[in-house]
Amino acid sequence: MASKPIVKWNTFVSAHQQFNERAHRYAYGKRGREGPFALSEAVRESLQDRSSLSLKATNARARIEFCRAARRIMRRIVKPTLDRPAYFLTLSPINFVTSAAEAETYDWSMLQKWAEEQLKGFCYFGIVDAAPYANTPRGREKVVSWHIHAIVWNASRDEMQALKDSINKRHQSLLPNRDAAHFRVRSSWKGLRQSLTYMLKAPLKTYRVYPIKDSNKRPTGEYRQKKDWHRSGEAAAVCRFMHGAEIDKLCVAGLEGREILKDVAARSVATIREQDATRVRALIRAVG
């Protein structure tokens, strides 16, 4: 699959299914079961279909149903227009970058608390995400950039710009030529739906950093990044550092967003229960 932005529903579903296949292939292969890079039984269990009811962050079915519920509920409540748009906000200060080893025990509630302080008084619904980097501007060190994606509404462009400027004055990003805070204006449901879909994906890609050079092939001090789908070992690393996380517990929300989060979590769990009951009834009919 080409590395396209995950903003369409079919792409979202297929990307999570492929992540699930890669993670399973590693988890139940020799490397995943034996030796220093083996996955624990608890990590493997999180990948199983039966773990979807717990909304495990690495569970493909849970991600799909959580996103499906969010798209339906947000469409009913958040109605962006040209005059009253919504915003897709990303917060990625370097303060919340950890080494790959530290990521396995990282307490992302620190990032959540920080984001909640920045967004006090705003209507928003967002989530903690993780971007694994195979290298950094400093060299071949593997790190994980923990960050927040959020949908913000009932705010003016001036308020959003002031928020962005305030954060960028106080915080740097992993890449020196990138802002720690940035946002995109969403004035239609189509654009907002795409941002919401992107926001709720699992960490599905690995990033690599490259120096930007001038016409004389000398480094400019700026960097660009590329991302591509995880290899099996990279997918396994995500399973390790996201182990124990539940999708709804990774979320952040303010004002009207709190009720949205509550409804999305409840609806996604209810849908999974209904699907399981339907499967059982079909099985009973088949053997009866």
Positions of the model-derived regions?
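Right-hand nucleic-acid polymerase module
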Residues: M1-V144, N154-G288
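Acceptor-substrate binding/catalytic loop of class I
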Residues: H147
